[in-house]
Every structure is written in C-alpha cells, then in structure tokens.
Amino acid sequence: APRHLVVAGPRTGIAVVAAQFEAAGASRLVHLAVQTPSHTPLLSQAALAFKKRLSVLPERRLSFPVLSAIDATAARTASSALDALARQISTPLNWASCLQTVREMQPDAVLEIGPGNALARLFSELAPEIPVRATDDFRSCEGIVRWLEAGNR
C-alpha cells in the first residue's frame, strides 16, 4: 500500500522506470508475471465495452457501500458502483487509499475475495488490530464460515 507501487506498460518502458527506481534507492523491485495491461489506458476500449454491458442492470440503492479502488469513494447506488467497476479496468488503482478507508469504517473483520492474498497482507500491515484473511487462505467455503463464526481469530 503506502510503500508499494505497481507500474504497468510496455517492457521497454518498465525497464527504464525500474532503472530510475533503482537509482533513487528502491529496496526491492519485483517483475509480476502478468500478461494483461490491467488498470491502464491500454484497456480503455475494454472498459467502454464492459460499461455498455453493465448498463442493462437495474438502478437501485445499495444495501452497503461499494468502494472504488481508484479513489476509495463509496458508491451507494448500483449505477455509481457499476461505473466505478468499469473505470477500474483502464484506470490506475489506489489500494492505499482504499485500504485506509476500509480501516476507517472499523470493520469487525476483512475478507479478501478473489485470487491470492496480496491485499489481505497489505491490510494486515496497515491495521494489525483488525482480523483479515483471503478466500485463498481456506480450502472450502465452510472454512470461511467457521472463521467468521469463530469471531475472526
């Protein structure tokens, strides 16, 4: 989050940026094995197509806020949440702000849904007092339910 940064683009551009970070004293650089230029303008056409696909869904007030990973803004209607979801495809994300907003919401626990556990690890650094896990930490849905029922410890 605050100490982590992801840079995306063509390999030649990444090499130039990596050299600049090393010269500036970066302590660690990791090349992610990702083939899709997610969260970059290179996917702007995909974002537009996705937004069009989502536009058929009904408008309604949400029963819980949905945070935009772009700027940690809380969407409270379906249309604003779906708009943010589509924009996230081609816009850089600000996980640090998003995780800070989650912390400020004072949840009883946080469960990262999706592949991996990178965000759960980042959140545990930011808010060690809040129990956090990722779905990938569990072998089954029943394990997740047991964790939640046990008070998240």
For each of these PLM feature ranges, what is it?
Residues 1-153:
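Acyl-group transfer acyltransferase/transacylase scaffold of fatty acid/polyketide systems
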